[in-house]
Amino acid sequence: MLRLPTVLRQMRPVSRALAPHLTRAYAKDVKFGADARALMLQGVDLLADAVAVTMGPKGRTVIIEQSWGSPKVTKDGVTVAKAIDLKDKYKNIGAKLVQDVANNTNEEAGDGTTTATVLARSIAKEGFEKISKGANPVEIRRGVMLAVDAVIAELKKQSKPVTTPEEIAQVATISANGDKDIGNIISDAMKKVGRKGVITVKDGKTLNDELEIIEGMKFDRGYISPYFINTSKGQKCEFQDAYVLLSEKKISSVQSIVPALEIANAHRKPLVIIAEDVDGEALSTLVLNRLKVGLQVVAVKAPGFGDNRKNQLKDMAIATGGAVFGEEGLNLNLEDVQAHDLGKVGEVIVTKDDAMLLKGKGEKAQIEKRIQEITEQLEITTSEYEKEKLNERLAKLSDGVAVLKVGGTSDVEVNEKKDRVTDALNATRAAVEEGIVLGGGCALLRCIPALDSLKPSNEDQKIGIEIIKRALKIPAMTIAKNAGVEGSLIVEKILQSSSEIGYDAMLGDFVNMVEKGIIDPTKVVRTALLDAAGVASLLTTAEAVVTEIPKEEKDPGMGAMGGMGGGMGGGMF
């Protein structure tokens, strides 16, 4: 007879004792029909309620607990949506689907996440109600999408292009929750770097917001030796109308740089050397000549590493009209340098931390071609790090970079304002791209008559169109509700008024929205509706929901430990 080893015989009762506490990792729970939809809708409601309170000029803030640091105070819809994670799996699925709506709208338009969330809730809620009364969910979805297409076509008709800096400031002000200072600073930034220029948002170091414009090519590498300083003001090296020598390789030999120095001297121009490194005999000779005969030269290490360094050097060559020595595929030796191989810049400023090449003399056509190449790479890449580096390179080649430095008295205040500045910046870019429509939810209200002419194929599609008709009133109603007035009355008054009249929630009065500058970017309104309708109408077609049953993790030794604790307690006294 086969006998089990003693160890295994002893283990069998233990395994039986553990058995009740173990559940399979792949066990699932399934709910069907109305039960599943009701639970998902509770999740949708919870998330939408939390996000909706932030809507409009009199919307409130939401305080979010964070795993580290102080709580986050925000009025940004997508930030609130992302923070919500519900314990109940079915409710959480509903919440996560609406979270996706907010995320998609934010990624595509950069703003309008609160509008998208309240629209999604309205469409899902009405859809569930009609399905419970026997309507066909697939046909309802078709009706919804038919209505959405008609609304988008109407929005395009209403849309007007953004033409003046004042309109840009108005769009930014509305998106920044009525903060005119933010609106003006964004308008100034766009004026200075162009509508397609690069604008970045950073933490400031003062109480006030500041705008810094960085023109030309700036990189974070300073002079190799402080002996290159040629001005007493600010410990920097400054040259006008200089030549630029670019090298991918390290320069150690003095013979390799003599030809370039001779060319610069013959043309009576300063020389800027940008290489992987300049050391040894080459560096000591440059410093000695700088000190003894006043040689106009400065040596700087090339920025970045690996391929990024090669790309940045190539960008500099194109911007200055020079060539990169040591570049793969080019048989260029430093000893054979000609005047046309050197880049040319109108001004150079080098400090101990960074260098700036201004007014490069590169060919416009070549620079445009390089910008196009980088733009194409940006569209392909999925890496956030790569995107950041490509955007930096793009900024240096284009009209420069505008840096918005957000000020405040504390980190909490700066972070809250940064959210609003980022939203305002995204809204402004969207407005420049596709134009503007009436703000305050009025644009969607003005689209309702366009749905009357639609001809649905059946009654269920007609229900889908009616769902969108009612949903289009929700953004304006939510803004009014947050301002402390009855939303349905406000909506009815707007619908009875002339086309440009709307409700100014800040003043609590009916005004001409265009004259008051209460406008929204067309792209933001369009994207919010499209994303909300797409996800919410899909949600209504769900008939079954599958979730994972969480694993029970109980420590079988805990009971014994509890006994020990009691015994030990008795022994202590």
UniProtKB/Swiss-Prot annotation:
CDD domains per UniProt: GroEL
Keyword annotations: Acetylation, ATP-binding, Chaperone, Isomerase, Isopeptide bond, Mitochondrion, Nucleotide-binding, Phosphoprotein, Transit peptide, Ubl conjugation
Phosphotyrosine sites (modified residues): 90
Residues annotated with Phosphoserine modification: 67, 70, 410, 488
SUPFAM superfamilies registered for this protein in UniProt: GroEL apical domain-like, GroEL equatorial domain-like, GroEL-intermediate domain like
Presequence positions on this chain: 1-26
Stored InterPro entries: Chaperonin_Cpn60_CS, Cpn60/GroEL, Cpn60/GroEL/TCP-1, GroEL-like_apical_dom_sf, GROEL-like_equatorial_sf, TCP-1-like_intermed_sf
Sites bearing N6-acetyllysine, chain numbering: 75, 82, 87, 91, 125, 130, 133, 156, 191, 202, 205, 218, 236, 249-250, 269, 292, 314, 352, 359, 389, 396, 455, 469, 481
Main location (coarse class): mitochondrion
Family in the record: Belongs to the chaperonin (HSP60) family.
NCBIfam families in the cross-refs: GroEL (TIGR02348), PRK00013.1 (NF000592), PRK12849.1 (NF009487), PRK12850.1 (NF009488), PRK12851.1 (NF009489)
Summary of subunit composition and partner proteins: Homoheptamer arranged in a ring structure. The functional units of these chaperonins consist of heptameric rings of the large subunit Hsp60, which function as a back-to-back double ring. Interacts with 2 heptameric Hsp10 rings to form the symmetrical football complex. Interacts with HRAS. Interacts with ATAD3A. Interacts with ETFBKMT and EEF1AKMT3. Interacts with MFHAS1.
Name of this protein: 60 kDa heat shock protein, mitochondrial
Source organism per UniProt: Cricetulus griseus (Chinese hamster)
Source lineage: Eukaryota, Metazoa, Chordata, Craniata, Vertebrata
